[in-house]
Amino acid sequence: MSKVTVAAIQMPYGLETAVEKVREAAAQGAQIILLPELFENWYFCQEKNYENYHLATTLEENPAVNELKKIARDFRVVLPVSYYERVGNTTFNTVAIIDADGSVLGQYRKTHIPDDHFYQEKFYFTPGDTGFRVWDTAYAKIGVGICWDQWFPESARCMALMGAELLFYPTAIGSEPILDCDSMPHWRRCMQGHAAANIMPLVAANRIGTEVVTPSPDNQNQTSSLTFYGSSFIADETGALVEQAGRDADEILTHTFDLDAIRELRRSWGVFRDRRPEMYGAMGHFG
């Protein structure tokens, strides 16, 4: 199939809302639909609280995966589903790839795990062990990174080299109280660069809303507040924004791409032909 329609869903957290928005996106003709990172629950990584470990589930038990498998089958859509995964005594930040027949093609576990006062993910997630992966779905070969992965050009390049035709980044990002800056433009430009450098469309879906941590004995009286800035977008193969959302409203973005035409453009530029991997030894060392 040459043409494919993708969608980014921007919303506050909640499974019921996610199901509703996926149905709406499918009704608009979307075939591959991206929801935000960890959309089932509030962004619990704002605090260190052992009680939040109970939010982790196995793939088989996860409510979002099970509900969206049915939606995928009924509407013939592909859904990368972000969730908090438990495997034995280990927990991961994971995306399950649900194909258009409702089957799970496989999973990707987040590689890069951030850690500061407002994004305390190292407390909850073990660094992923899957490596970057690409799935041959019903509509396209897709690669998926998760939030902080989107800041690393290596992530996108690995997926491109593995044959991805589209890149997807479920996200939960907002205000930066420590840095005291608005990171949104930087965030967008970073991924637009990945799209341009790999000559590959890219979809990013972020949540919205303000989420506040209430101090308690369980979280050592921590306090925190994050305002997620939405601004979800779809970039084309040149990195140009072809669809973009605002900062604070529920939105569904859709766009149709001609994968055959993009493949020819990618070949014509020669950026993969002219790579010199033998010269990139520094990439294997810490900076």
Name the predicted role of every residue range.
Residues 3-13, 94, 107, 134, ...:
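Active-site-proximal beta-strand elements of phosphoester/diester hydrolases
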Residues 110-124, 249-267:
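A short, polar/charged loop-to-alpha-helix boundary motif
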Residues 81-83, 94-97, 133, 232-234, ...:
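Short beta-strand scaffold segments in enzyme catalytic cores
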Residues 57-80, 141, 147-252:
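CN hydrolase (nitrilase-like) catalytic-core segments centered on the catalytic cysteine
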Residues 46-55, 117, 217-223:
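Short glycine/proline- and charge-enriched loop/turn segments
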Residues 130-162, 262-287:
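Cysteine/selenocysteine-centered motifs that mediate thiol-based redox chemistry or coordinate metal-sulfur cofactors
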Residues 19-107, 173-200:
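Cys-nucleophile CN-hydrolase/nitrilase-fold catalytic domain and related Cys-dependent amidase chemistry
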Residues 1-32, 168:
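N-terminal active-site segment of His-dependent metallophosphoesterases
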